[in-house]
Swiss-Prot record:
Name under which the protein is recorded: Adapter protein MecA
Self-association state and partner proteins as the record states: Homodimer.
Gene field: mecA
Organism of origin: Streptococcus pneumoniae serotype 19F (strain G54)
Free-text function comment from the UniProt entry: Enables the recognition and targeting of unfolded and aggregated proteins to the ClpC protease or to other proteins involved in proteolysis.
Record-stated family: Belongs to the MecA family.
Lineage: Bacteria, Bacillati, Bacillota, Bacilli, Lactobacillales
Description of its domains: The N-terminal domain probably binds unfolded/aggregated proteins; the C-terminal domain interacts with ClpC.
GO molecular function: protein-macromolecule adaptor activity
């Protein structure tokens, strides 16, 4: 569970499904407003370290956005306290003016003062909706980028001599799916297919740097090698080269 302050009036609390289960809640509990849900919200606020600006607030509103693997709770503080204090409504006339007002005039003045206060709340809700929309767009973009990420990489290395190729092959200790050996324009080209799906993001660059200690990185594509190069080993080239000498 984590909390993020979005603005002076809004907090975002993110809870995993496990967080909910640990507290005896499930997503279905948020679909219908009930006393249990409200008690849960305030219990969470007590559990987290609240910013000072929220400690002495009046009313709090809660907005729940369920996700497949988590729940986002947006907490917005109101500038109007549940127990309305006329002293907080600075736009109200003083007592002498109040005494000269008719009941209708007083009600209209009171409604205007409250409307001015609630304007901030409406703006806060609109701002919150914009924040939610941006966060959803960002999450969707990240998911799309992740789905487009290729789980495999073909490394293509170039060698001037076969002896250099054998030396490199004997240094290979990382896991690979397969490897091929081609010859084209009097040079040897080794393709190595590596599964990077379960490795950290820096791994491909680190692996390439390690390979380049013994070989030249090539800008020739595998399709070019397949079409114009001579195939010397169509699979497990590295394993076969390791057996030499």
């Amino acid at each position: 569970m984590k909390m993020k302050q979005i603005s002076d009036t809004t907090l975002k609390i993110t809870m995993s499904l496990e967080d909910l289960m640990d507290r005896g809640m499930e997503i279905a509990d948020f679909l219908v407003p009930q006393e249990k849900t409200e008690e849960f919200f305030y219990a969470i606020l007590d559990e987290l370290e609240m910013p000072d600006s929220f400690l002495d607030t009046g009313m709090l509103s809660f907005r729940v956005t369920p996700k497949p693997d988590k729940v986002d709770v947006f907490v917005t503080k109101s500038k109007i306290d549940q127990n309305l204090d006329f002293e907080d409504l600075s736009d109200l006339p003083d007592m002498e003016e109040l005494a000269q007002m008719s009941p209708d005039e007083f009600i209209k003045t009171l409604e205007k003062s409250i409307a001015d206060k609630t304007k901030d709340d409406i703006e806060a809700i609109q701002s919150l909706e914009q924040v939610e929309a941006k966060e959803e767009e960002q999450e969707q973009a990240e998911q799309e980028a992740e789905s487009k990420k290729e789980p495999y990489i073909y490394y293509i290395l170039s060698f001037a001599k076969l002896a250099d190729l054998v030396v490199f092959a004997k240094t290979v200790t990382f896991e690979m799916e397969t490897s091929e050996l081609y010859k084209m324009n009097e040079r040897y080209y080794l393709t190595i297919l590596v599964d990077i799906e379960n490795h950290p993001s820096p791994y491909p660059a680190w692996l390439l740097a390690r390979m380049r200690e013994f070989a030249d990185d090539s800008d020739i594509s595998r399709s070019v090698l397949q079409e114009y190069g001579q195939v010397l080993m169509s699979h497990d080239a590295v394993l076969n080269l390791q057996k030499i000498g």
